[in-house]
């Protein structure tokens, strides 16, 4: 599958004309949101997808800024031929309220004082971020989104969208996140905040325009956070216990290990692009996030109407699989249409930003709903039920296949025989095909989604499914190899 970048892009600014009322009861004036768009909005305005960024992300999700050395943060899935195909969809991403990459936040000018807000900026929530995004979507003339998609804190925003504005999207893809922040997640954020607040140059948030800023505290906060984005396995693979630019231990407090050097690099790079006060405000918004009502998640989600996709990462210990499954259970309890997938990766939490093939496959299947008809093989060798086992072996050998659908004279599916069945027939001294074939065979329809049949094949440990019509007549087959090839094409 041929893929391209969206190319050169520019960040735009949307100004909210009226006051923005916040969850705290306070209001903000002159709010601006930085945003980028990719692709074209169709005439009916039905092809828009909102992408929500994670904690330290921004509006630059794809493409290249002028003189940039790297593309947007989700380049792997946004662009022509990718899951968020900009030849098909109009993709929108905005910097969150409280951010520092063009949207109004604590580093912005307070219209009442003509100075930076600093700690006069009100506490914000994920709900406030989404409320501001809604105004942007309305400004773009979009009444209903095709989908809202987000990972990590972006997944929280996507979830909040489904609760706050249930009629404004068809689909929601919720990735590597939770429906309510856990004590451990809150604890990590608090340690990060304290590292900033304890920096002597934080100066109670009043460091704008000064020569010294809380760079050290913000760098440590980033180092702490970055550890949670990785997995133990990924750190072993990337660093092991290798030393950094030395052959032996130094026996002092300089950097010995590569992993130490890496974390320092992450911290030093981060302070060049992020505001310390924004980090305080955004992590507090994450801590406050809880969609349950009186402890009940189903009660908090009872009004959602979107079709859901939940994607977890098997090595994610920041937002572990169990939290995604809690969300899945709550939605299933409500009878909401929902699918669940786990990305297999050593990368940890950051896998949703890095696993090109798996993320494109899962998102593409959900957003575009690829169906069996797109992949199935129609030129399929079959065998008559009255044939012998030797006949089956010859057909398999001649056609280099391991599965043979068994059909009658009208091509009606009667069963399936596999190479494994033929092996068993030798041990049991069977002669007739009917004695070894599977009669109660699982099958699918050409209109079934690839996502659905992938789950079925995994659940029942099946590598091949016959495809039948409404009369149970054979139309073709689909195999796990074909699905794997689709994944590898991204």
From Swiss-Prot:
Superkingdom of origin: Archaea
Catalytic reaction annotation: L-homoserine + acetyl-CoA = O-acetyl-L-homoserine + CoA
Binding sites annotated in the UniProt record for substrate: 222, 350
Gene3D superfamilies noted in UniProt: 1.10.1740.110, alpha/beta hydrolase, CBS-domain
Active-site residues annotated for this sequence: 152 (nucleophile), 316, 349
Subcellular location: Cytoplasm
MF-aspect GO terms: homoserine O-acetyltransferase activity
Primary location class: cytoplasm
Ranges for domain AB hydrolase-1: 47-355
UniProt keywords, alphabetically: Acyltransferase, Amino-acid biosynthesis, CBS domain, Cytoplasm, Methionine biosynthesis, Repeat, Transferase
Pathway, per record: Amino-acid biosynthesis; L-methionine biosynthesis via de novo pathway; O-acetyl-L-homoserine from L-homoserine: step 1/1
EC number(s) stated in the UniProt entry for this protein: 2.3.1.31
This protein's GO CC annotations: cytoplasm
GO biological process, one term: methionine biosynthetic process
CBS domain location: 376-436, 437-490
PANTHER family attached to this UniProt entry: HOMOSERINE O-ACETYLTRANSFERASE
Description of how the protein assembles with itself and partners: Homodimer.
Family as reported in the entry's similarity comment: Belongs to the AB hydrolase superfamily. MetX family.
Task of the protein: Transfers an acetyl group from acetyl-CoA to L-homoserine, forming acetyl-L-homoserine.
HAMAP family, alphabetized: MetX_acyltransf
The name this protein goes by in its record: Homoserine O-acetyltransferase
Organism from which the protein derives: Methanobrevibacter ruminantium (strain ATCC 35063 / DSM 1093 / JCM 13430 / OCM 146 / M1) (Methanobacterium ruminantium)
